[in-house]
């Protein structure tokens, strides 16, 4: 899905919870540890959102391409990139670059937004198609534990003074979570209301590992959060590092 109303408020609600500079350094460490290609400084930030991570990766020295399906999010990203980063409006299943990159990152549970296994398989195939042999695909996902115990059927409220947000979750037995966001922006004595609706799905490790293998990736490691340790039973975020095998990627429809 592509954010619309959420784009205007994303950085205020999410930005304060994420240290993008630290996250960029963490991804950089993983890329340097596992990548084996002369193209590794050419990097794709897939589902780049408002571009905060893209900017930090660019500052480290990567030649960054940012891709997102939301034109509204990319408008925010372009203002931050100041012409130094190429931003493209593309969905996972229509990813189309001019050549291969040495590294692909996909952060902040973006892949959880793909709620159909066949669609996730297609997305992995597109990523493999544009990843150079020896290049790496680094992504994070919300875990089944987070969907079951943290998101669940809970409601979260954010009060930022002039901006009020109600975040409501409904999670089913398959660990697909429907998320309803209602934003109230104050202007004087009045409030403007906007809403956003989307779904996220938790995938098992076995499913992710199988789809990566089918796409032409070797799974190098799975880490918890921003660590280099394996995920524990109560891990809310898992980071996958996979290396592109030599040879053809999986067939792309």
Predicted regions and their residues:
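A short glycine-rich, Lys/Arg-flanked "PGG" loop and its adjoining helix->strand segment in the class I
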Residues: 121-133
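C-terminal lobe and adjacent flexible extensions of AdoMet/dcAdoMet transferase-like proteins
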Residues: 205-253
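A short acidic, Gly/Pro-enriched loop at the edge of an enzyme's catalytic core
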Residues: 96-103
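Conserved class I S-adenosyl-L-methionine
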Residues: 1-47
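Class I SAM-dependent methyltransferase SAM/SAH-binding core
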Residues: 44, 51-94
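SAM-dependent methyltransferase
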Residues: 138-211
């Amino acid at each position: 899905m592509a954010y619309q109303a959420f784009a205007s408020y994303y950085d205020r609600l999410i930005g304060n919870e994420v240290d993008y500079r630290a996250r960029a350094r963490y991804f950089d460490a993983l890329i340097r540890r596992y990548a084996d290609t002369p193209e590794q400084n050419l990097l794709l930030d897939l589902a780049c959102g408002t571009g905060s991570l893209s900017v930090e990766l660019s500052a480290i020295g990567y030649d960054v391409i940012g891709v997102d399906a939301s034109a509204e999010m990319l408008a925010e990203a372009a203002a931050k990139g100041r012409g130094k980063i190429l931003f493209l409006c593309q969905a996972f299943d229509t990813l189309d670059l001019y050549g291969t990159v040495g590294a692909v990152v996909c952060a902040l549970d973006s892949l959880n937004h793909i709620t159909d296994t066949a669609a996730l398989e297609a997305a992995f195939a597109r990523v493999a198609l544009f990843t150079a042999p020896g290049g790496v695909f680094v992504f994070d996902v919300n875990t089944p534990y987070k969907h079951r115990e943290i998101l669940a059927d809970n409601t979260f409220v954010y009060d930022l003074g002039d901006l009020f947000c109600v975040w409501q979750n409904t999670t089913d037995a398959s660990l697909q979570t429907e998320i309803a966001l209602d934003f109230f922006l104050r202007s004087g004595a009045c409030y403007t209301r906007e809403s956003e609706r989307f779904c996220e799905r938790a995938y098992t490790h076995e499913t992710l590992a199988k789809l990566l293998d089918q796409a032409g990736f070797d799974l190098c490691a799975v880490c918890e959060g921003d660590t280099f340790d394996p995920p524990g039973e109560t891990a809310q975020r898992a980071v996958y590092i996979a290396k592109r095998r030599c040879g053809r990627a999986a067939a792309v429809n």
